[in-house]
UniProtKB/Swiss-Prot annotation:
Enzyme class (EC, first level): oxidoreductase
Molecular-function GO term, any one: oxidoreductase activity
Keyword Lyase appears in the UniProt entry: no
Catalyzed chemical reaction(s): agroclavine + NADP(+) = didehydroagroclavine + NADPH + H(+)
Pathway annotation from the record: Alkaloid biosynthesis; ergot alkaloid biosynthesis
Top-level taxon: Eukaryota
Pfam families referenced in this protein's UniProt entry, alphabetically: NmrA
One record GO biological process: indole alkaloid biosynthetic process
Subunit structure, interactors included: Monomer.
Name used for this protein in its record: Agroclavine dehydrogenase
The family this protein is said to belong to: Belongs to the fgaFS/easG family.
Amino acid sequence: MTILLTGGSGKTAGHIANLLKEAKLPFIVGSRSSNPHTVERHRTFDWLDEATFNNVLSVDEGMEPVSVVWLVSPPILDLAPPVIRFIDFASSRGVKRFVLLSASTVEKGGPAMGLIHAHLDTIEGVSYTVLRPSWFMENFSTRGEFPCDTIREEDTIYSAAKDGKIPFISVADIARVALRALTAPALHNKDHVLLGPELLTYDDVAEILTRVVGRNIHHVRLTESELAAKLQERGMPADEAAMHASLDSIVEAGAEEKLNTEVKDLTGEEPRHFADFVSDNKNVWLMRD
């Protein structure tokens, strides 16, 4: 089998690609732009351009056809329709297994990825797995992400989550589960909520960063509307900023305040602690432009 990784320039695909290389499993990567780590396997792919759909299902001579797809939805508000169109296209061309990256609070039939989840459940002859991780630790360490940039530039984390708690999870842990989902039939037609090993408020996050990085990192509590305005100041469109800010209100209400053992149950290893993640990545915040 050959595995297709969509979202090739995103956080998860690079980690999964490295695991597939180590396992010597054939794969290709689809995205609008190539990732330096996967450039030799890259195919141009755009969710909003159906002319590119067949491109990512074409394989090099000697490779088996694409039969498994890692689905990472495009970063647009109305994300379900183009993903569903691609799923239907791919399944009509022999793809038999899909693994969807969703989110911990999104149930089947809910908005956005929940609509894609529900659609996968209707396709005969196709198996699927849905991974529903909580918030990524890497949002704090990826340049261009709001939390990372404000920590680096202002020693500040802005949120509207107040005392809401989040079981932050590392992309490396998500990738290890994804590898199993892409290759292990036993995980099919299920969803898995993937959580980190501890519940942290943004005050806790700021305290850990302060301790490890050696600078005083502050958590500034905003209202939802104030956070949306702050995101717009950083160049985010108004509707997208409002959506992102509303997620913090969901956190404040306790929607993410939960723990489980899914990562260890599926991989045999405990998920990473946030303090260890910060220690391993502290140069991101130590180095300033």
